[in-house]
């Protein structure tokens, strides 16, 4: 019968860290321990499985072998019999094949590329629309200026790894074959630091802050990301640096709202202007422009001003500015103004004057019909 996957036995993912594995083992071991389940053969068998899985997954060499070859790594005298070395060496015949399949290969493992960094940049709407150049200061890892990235104390050199003899790989028995595995002693680098640099302690990198000038193109919006190649953390022992990603966040504007490449704003007008029409000034990002408001304009009407929006960062036509009219009810009226409005209302035929207020007529006709239907 096929053996159960070790990760499934412990209930952890294949990327689980050692502390997660230990925590899962402790919980399951307490549950299935023979002392707590005396005479229960199933619990005893389960406890053995848990212990076996724990022993493999907390041993870095055994876990690496299991991840690549599964249970076969420990069968037919695999790692359990002799570990590294010994046995028939078919690496010249099968080395490239196993290297391609399992990601190992026979060459030395490359030093790790530096990590990518992220910087959150807040922009005003004006900066986002027009583009801007900003200086930023970021904490990062840079090459040690004492050992120049080698990790070794000045005057010394990294030593060849005695386990893999500088290849970064060791042979591991897999059934009838000997296949290549990353050296667990030097982690595939092929060298060891005997006398580490006093400044970087053998890492080849030190923490520093650096200042960069970042050019933000016109038209960016919240969520856009700008990549600065090679401006991330420097890699280990001379490996390439990672990248820096600048994440854009545009601040809320007191007047405009942005949707895609269009801008929206609310323009208040008094009811006399709405009824009679006229000309008003409206704001744009380039200054004030005149807008002609026709008579009988209702609240919510949109006026489109073409080309007054945002030019797309990806090219194409410039967006528009859409002005939404809001008709304001006057406040703080004096007696004369109230009298004039009263006369105006009476000239309409009362509060629900039908001739001059078609929407009011439609509304009250609907209300009347509703109550008429209820009384039938």
From Swiss-Prot:
GO CC annotations?
cytoplasm
Check the record and name the Pfam families matching this protein: DnaJ, DnaJ_C, DnaJ_CXXCXGXG
Q: Which residues bind Zn(2+) 2?
A: 161, 164, 183, 186
Positions of Zn(2+) 1 binding: 144, 147, 197, 200
Does the record bear Transport in its keywords? Answer: no
Cystine connections? none
> In the record, what terms sit under GO molecular function?
ATP binding; heat shock protein binding; unfolded protein binding; zinc ion binding
Query: Which controlled-vocabulary keywords does the entry list?
Result: Chaperone, Cytoplasm, DNA replication, Metal-binding, Repeat, Stress response, Zinc, Zinc-finger
Q: Which residues form the J domain?
A: 5-70
Give compartment(s): Cytoplasm
Cofactor binding remark: Binds 2 Zn(2+) ions per monomer.
Q: Assembly and interactions? A: Homodimer.
- What PANTHER family is this protein classified in? CHAPERONE PROTEIN DNAJ (PTHR43096:SF48), DNAJ HOMOLOG 1, MITOCHONDRIAL-RELATED (PTHR43096)
Question: Function, please?
Answer: Participates actively in the response to hyperosmotic and heat shock by preventing the aggregation of stress-denatured proteins and by disaggregating proteins, also in an autonomous, DnaK-independent fashion. Unfolded proteins bind initially to DnaJ; upon interaction with the DnaJ-bound protein, DnaK hydrolyzes its bound ATP, resulting in the formation of a stable complex. GrpE releases ADP from DnaK; ATP binding to DnaK triggers the release of the substrate protein, thus completing the reaction cycle.
Q: Which NCBIfam families match?
A: DnaJ_bact, PRK10767.1
Q: What is known of its domains?
A: The J domain is necessary and sufficient to stimulate DnaK ATPase activity. Zinc center 1 plays an important role in the autonomous, DnaK-independent chaperone activity of DnaJ. Zinc center 2 is essential for interaction with DnaK and for DnaJ activity.
Protein name from the UniProt record: Chaperone protein DnaJ
Organism, by scientific name, is Shigella dysenteriae serotype 1 (strain Sd197)
**Name of the encoding gene:** dnaJ
């Amino acid at each position: 019968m096929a053996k159960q996957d070790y990760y499934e036995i412990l209930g952890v993912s294949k990327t689980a860290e050692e502390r997660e594995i230990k925590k899962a083992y402790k919980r399951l071991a307490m549950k299935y321990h023979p002392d707590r389940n005396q005479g229960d053969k199933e619990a005893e068998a389960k406890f053995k499985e848990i212990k076996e899985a724990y022993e493999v997954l907390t041993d870095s060499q055994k876990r690496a072998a299991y991840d690549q070859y599964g249970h076969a790594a420990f069968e037919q005298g695999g790692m359990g019999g002799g570990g590294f070395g010994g046995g028939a060496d078919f690496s010249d015949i099968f080395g490239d094949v196993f290297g391609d399949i399992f990601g190992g290969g026979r060459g030395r493992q490359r030093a790790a590329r530096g990590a990518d960094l992220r910087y959150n940049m807040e922009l005003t709407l004006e900066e986002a629309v027009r583009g801007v150049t900003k200086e930023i200061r970021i904490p990062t890892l840079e090459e040690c200026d004492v050992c120049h990235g080698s990790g070794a104390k000045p005057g010394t050199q990294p030593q060849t790894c005695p386990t893999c003899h500088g290849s970064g790989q060791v042979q591991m028995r897999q059934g009838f074959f000997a296949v290549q595995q990353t050296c667990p002693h030097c982690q595939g680098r092929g060298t060891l630091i005997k006398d580490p640099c006093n400044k970087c302690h053998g890492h080849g990198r030190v923490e520093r802050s650096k200042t960069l000038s970042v050019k933000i193109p016109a038209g960016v919006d919240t969520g856009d990301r700008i990549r600065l190649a090679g401006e991330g953390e420097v890699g280990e022992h001379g490996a390439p640096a990672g990248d820096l990603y600048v994440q854009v966040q545009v601040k809320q504007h007191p007047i405009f709202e942005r949707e895609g490449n269009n801008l929206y704003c609310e323009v208040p007008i008094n009811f006399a202007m709405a009824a009679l029409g006229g000309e008003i000034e409206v704001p744009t990002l380039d200054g004030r422009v005149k807008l002609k408001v026709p008579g009988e304009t209702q609240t919510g009407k949109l006026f489109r001003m073409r080309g007054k929006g945002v030019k797309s960062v990806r090219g194409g036509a410039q967006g528009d500015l859409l002005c939404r009219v809001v008709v304001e009810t006057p406040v703080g009226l004096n007696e004369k103004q109230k009298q004039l409005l009263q006369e105006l209302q009476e000239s309409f035929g009362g509060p629900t004057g039908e001739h001059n207020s078609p929407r009011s007529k439609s509304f009250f006709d609907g209300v009347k019909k509703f109550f008429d239907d209820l009384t039938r």
